[in-house]
UniProtKB/Swiss-Prot annotation:
Keywords: Chaperone, Cytoplasm. Molecular chaperone capable of stabilizing a range of proteins. Seems to fulfill an ATP-independent, HSP70-like function in archaeal de novo protein folding. The gene is pfdA. One of its GO terms (biological process) is protein folding. This is Prefoldin subunit alpha. Disulfide bonds: none annotated. The keyword RNA-binding does not apply.
Length: 149
């Protein structure tokens, strides 16, 4: 006969399950931000390429609130890149594309790491859920056995 179900073990497993679930939510949000950053960088690369081909052609420039104004890009090969801490550097169009491609590689590596962590957490969650199910079945069997006496 198996040892009786220890309520402390059940409570401990529930706590771990809650913690892992919260961690998974945080990592999932971070992964979503990485994926959004990659999409945004790819869109910026496409825009820079189109601007280089168009030269000094008029474009619609968003100004917020769903509004755009018609503008002419005077120097499409001058791109100003924010590198953080309110620091902006001037790059050529190709330099900006190269910078974005490097950032994409970094974000893809981070996304890969986050995915691996999420997979490990998911495996741990499944193990805990399996153990909890075993304990619940065992507790039910104990109750049924005690009720038949």
């Amino acid at each position: 006969m198996a040892a009786p179900v220890d309520p402390r073990e059940v409570q401990s497993l529930q706590t771990y399950l809650n913690q892992y679930t919260q961690q998974a939510e945080v990592y999932s949000r971070q992964l979503g931000m990485m994926e959004e950053g990659i999409r945004e960088a790819n869109a910026s690369i496409e825009t820079l390429k189109a601007l280089a081909e168009a030269g000094e052609a008029p474009v619609f420039m968003p100004i917020g609130g769903g509004l755009n104004i018609r503008a002419t890009i005077i120097q499409p090969d001058e791109v100003f890149v924010s590198i953080g801490s309110d620091i902006i550097v001037q790059k050529t169009n190709e330099g900006a594309i190269s910078y974005l491609q490097d950032r994409i590689k970094e974000m893809e590596a981070t996304a890969k790491n986050l995915t691996e962590v999420l997979q490990k957490i998911d495996a741990q969650v499944k193990d805990i859920q399996k153990r909890l199910e075993q304990l619940y079945r065992q507790a039910q069997a104990e109750q049924q056995g005690a009720g038949s006496l």
